[in-house]
């Protein structure tokens, strides 16, 4: 099953953060914050503009992104967790 986002929305899968601090201390699940990094799984066709045109999105499938702590809406599909968010909620693309 797939999610096909509409307009300027993107579907993101969270990427797990390191569970060890820089000093080598293991961080338990209860103390760890939800990661704010993710991989774009699916993108909508683009943002509708006032003049009727559609502006394509700046992100594409496979991009690794940074997003805010409260960005988007969490959804579960076939046992997997995703976040559906607007492109405006994305802070940046991580370039490799």
Swiss-Prot record:
InterPro entries membership: Chaperonin_GroES, Chaperonin_GroES_sf, Chaprnonin_Cpn10_CS, GroES-like_sf
Can the keyword Ligase be found in this entry's annotation? Answer: no
- Gene Ontology terms: cellular component: cytoplasm
Among SMART domains, the record links this protein to:
Cpn10 (SM00883)
Q: Note the SS bond partners.
A: none
Q: Where are the transmembrane segments?
A: none
Keywords for this entry? Chaperone, Cytoplasm, Stress response
Q: Which GO terms describe its biological process?
A: chaperone cofactor-dependent protein refolding
* Record GO terms (molecular function): ATP binding; metal ion binding; protein folding chaperone; protein-folding chaperone binding; unfolded protein binding
Task: Name the Gene3D superfamilies for this protein.
Answer: GroES chaperonin
Subcellular compartments: Cytoplasm
State the function annotated in the UniProt record: Together with the chaperonin GroEL, plays an essential role in assisting protein folding. The GroEL-GroES system forms a nano-cage that allows encapsulation of the non-native substrate proteins and provides a physical environment optimized to promote and accelerate protein folding. GroES binds to the apical surface of the GroEL ring, thereby capping the opening of the GroEL channel.
Query: In which family does this protein belong, per the annotation?
Result: Belongs to the GroES chaperonin family.
- PANTHER family in the record: 10 KDA HEAT SHOCK PROTEIN, CO-CHAPERONIN GROES
Quaternary structure annotation from Swiss-Prot or TrEMBL: Heptamer of 7 subunits arranged in a ring. Interacts with the chaperonin GroEL.
Full protein name: Co-chaperonin GroES
Q: Which organism is it from?
A: Coxiella burnetii (strain RSA 493 / Nine Mile phase I)
Name the encoding gene, please. groES
